[in-house]
Amino acid sequence: MLLDVDPDTYAMKSHLVPDRLGVKAYLELPFNTPWRTLIISDDARDILSSQLVLNLNEPCAIEDTSWIKPMKFIGVWWEMFTGNQKTWAYSDDTLAKPGVTDYTQLKPNGRHPANTENVKRYIDFAAKHGIDGVLVEGWNEGWEDWAGYRKNRQFLFDKPYPDFDLPALRDYAKEKGVKLIMHHETAANAADYDLQLDRAFQFMKDNNYDAVKTGYVGAIIPRSEHHTSQWMIDHARNVIERAADYEIMVDSHEAPRPTGLCRTYPNWLAQESARGGEFESFGGNPPSHTCILPFTRLKGGPMDYTPGLFETRLSYYNEGKDSQAGTTLARQLALYLTMPSPMQMACDLPENYERFPDAFQFIKDVPVDWADSKYLEAEPNQYITVARLDKNSDDWYVGAITDGNSRVAEIDLSFLPKGKKYKATIYSDAPDAHWKDNPQAYQIKTVEVKPGKKLKQYLAPGGGAAIRIQSVDAK
C-alpha cells in the first residue's frame, strides 16, 4: 500500500498498487487485511523509538536462529559506481548467452573487478581489519547486456565468470576467517529467479556462502508487474522463506517496502527499498535525506544504506564526473548509529580507508547489534542524535547528524550508569568542515565524561559526529 498526498490540503489517501490488469488484490474468503498504522506524537523521538510496525508482525517463525549472525562487510561494488570505467561484465560481447556461450573464448574487457586477484585483495583487507565479509558483484555470467533488455533468462546463479576462481576464493576466504557474500542480481526477472531459487541456494551452501544480496534493477518480469504489487510482495516472502530453509541470510535491494516481516523471518537482515548510498554516484543525496529516512523507511525494518563513504567527490576518480555526496566524512561515521542495520556495509574502496586509518578505526569498532537505544534529540528533516548500547559489551555509541545547516548537538549523558568513570572518543567535523567545500575535515579527541552531564558537539553543514563511550576501568 502507498499513500497519495494532496499537495494542497496534505490529506492522505491509501493507494493499493494493482497488477498489470489493474487488479489490486486477489483474495479468497474469508481473509484478513494487513494492519494499517499511524504513529503520532508531539515528540519526534517517540516516533523513532516506536516498535509498533515490527510488533504487529507474527513472532519469529524460525525455530533455531543460531545460524543468523549480524555482520559488517566490504565489497567489490563501489568501484563500479565511481566513473572509472569498471564494470560488472567480464566481456563487451553483448551476444554472449549464459549457459550457452563458452566465456573462456571471449575477449576479456580488462575492466572487470570481480576477478580472483582483486577479490583476494578485498579478503586480505577484511581479514586485517576484522571485517566479517566480502560482497562480490559481477561474479556470474550474464552481465554483458543485463540492463533493460527484459530477457526471459538474464543470469545464471551457479556459473562464475572465467576470471572468478570460486573454489580458490572460497578456500582462501575460509583460511582467512572471512565470509564471501553472494550476489543475485535478477535484472528484475523475479519469475526466473523463482525457477532458479533452489539451485542457487544449494550452490551457495555447497560453496560456504551464508548470505546473499539480491537485486531487482529494472521493470519487473512478469511483464507489467510492479515492485510493490501483490505478486512481488508474495515473491519477496517466498525468497525469504526458502532462504530460511537453506539457513541463508538475505539483504534485498530494489525490493518492496518493508513492513516489519524481519520480525517473523530474522534472516531478512536488511533491505534497501529507498534511495540508498549508491545514489551518491547519481548526483548525490542531500544532507537532509538521512534525517528523514529513520522516520519513514526504517520504521519497517533495517536498511542497507551502505554508509562509510570517505571519498565523497567522484571527480577524484574521473574529472568528468561531478557527482558529490551531501555529507562530511564524520557524518558517514555517525550513520552507523542513525541508520542501524544488523548487516552493515563499509562501502568505500579499501585504499580510501587506508588514506584515513584513524577515522576508519570507528568503522572497525562500531557494533552492528544493539542491546538498547536512546533517542536524545530529533526533528524530521533536520537532525537526529541517538545513543546505542553494544549488545556484547558495556560500551555506548552516539551518532549525531544534521541537515544542510550547522548546529550544536546537545548530548544528554543521563543514559550512562552512575558510579563509573567514562572516556569518550569523539570523531567530529573540524571547525571549517562543510559537506560541499571541505568534506574530509575531521578531528578526533578523547575526553572524560560523566553520567547526567550534557556534552555539546558542533555539527558542520551536512555533518555529524560519532562517539564511543567506554568505562575507564573496562578491560
What are these regions (language model features)?
Residues G138-Q324, T328:
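Aromatic- and carboxylate-enriched substrate-binding clefts and catalytic-loop regions
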Residues T402-K475:
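C-terminal beta-sandwich/jelly-roll accessory domains of carbohydrate-active enzymes
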Residues P30-P34, I39, N55-Q85, D92-Q105:
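Feature activates predominantly on carbohydrate-active enzymes
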Residues N118-W139, D206-D210:
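Catalytic domains of carbohydrate-active enzymes, especially glycoside hydrolases
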Residues Y246-I248, S252-T425, D429-A433:
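Active-site-proximal substrate-binding groove within the catalytic cores of carbohydrate-active enzymes
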Residues M1-E63:
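N-terminal accessory beta-strand-rich subdomains and adjacent acidic, glycine-rich linkers
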Residues R45-D46, F81-N84, A126, E141-G148, ...:
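Flexible loop/turn segments at secondary-structure boundaries
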Residues M80-T94, G99-N118, H183-Q196:
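Active-site mouth loops of central-metabolism enzymes
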